[in-house]
């Protein structure tokens, strides 16, 4: 072999390719894991937003109510019915467990379903009331990736 020859050997090329492959696999793995983490966090944030929306909708209507009554619906789930000072029903909230598994708002008797408040599936909805307060404990939802979200709240009947 002559001493003035320049170039790289097959062994050197193989080593460089193996190192490049290891770096590429590491970068792809990091990207995929980051993407999965972002998706989980994003869907959980959406579920939290929907749970907050449901609680805020119930609270807004409850604050204007004179009387709040909780009774079981046809499926045995608690249904919150709100009445004004003239004892006229103006809002009701229920969990459609057997149907779309969402919290619905309605009004009137018999209830006119105004549709679901939010689109995140509900696992549990418990509501109770006394003379001056309405308690939601708990409202349990799950994100599309299965992350649980749970909220509880108490709200006052300010129109008493």
Q: Which ranges hold each PLM region?
A:
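Aliphatic-rich helix starts adjacent to a transmembrane/signal segment
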Residues: 4-59, 63
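Type IV pilin-like appendage domain
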Residues: 69-133, 150
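Short, exposed beta-strand-loop hairpins at the edges of beta-sheets
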Residues: 138-147
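Edge beta-strand at a domain terminus
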Residues: 148-160
């Amino acid at each position: 072999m002559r001493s003035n020859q320049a170039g790289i050997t097959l062994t050197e090329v193989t080593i460089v390719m193996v190192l490049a492959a290891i770096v590429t696999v590491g970068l792809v793995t990091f990207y995929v894991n980051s993407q999965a983490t972002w998706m989980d966090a994003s869907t959980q944030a959406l579920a939290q937003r929907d749970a907050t929306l449901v609680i805020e909708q119930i609270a807004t209507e409850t604050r204007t109510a004179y009387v709040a009554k909780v009774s079981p619906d046809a499926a045995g789930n608690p249904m919150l019915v709100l009445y004004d000072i003239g004892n006229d029903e103006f809002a009701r909230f229920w969990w459609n467990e057997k149907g779309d598994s969402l919290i619905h708002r309605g009004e009137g008797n018999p209830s006119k379903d105004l549709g679901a408040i939010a689109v995140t599936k509900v696992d549990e909805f418990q509501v109770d009331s006394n003379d001056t307060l309405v308690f939601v404990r708990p409202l349990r939802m799950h994100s599309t990736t299965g992350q649980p979200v749970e909220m509880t709240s108490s709200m006052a009947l300010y129109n008493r």
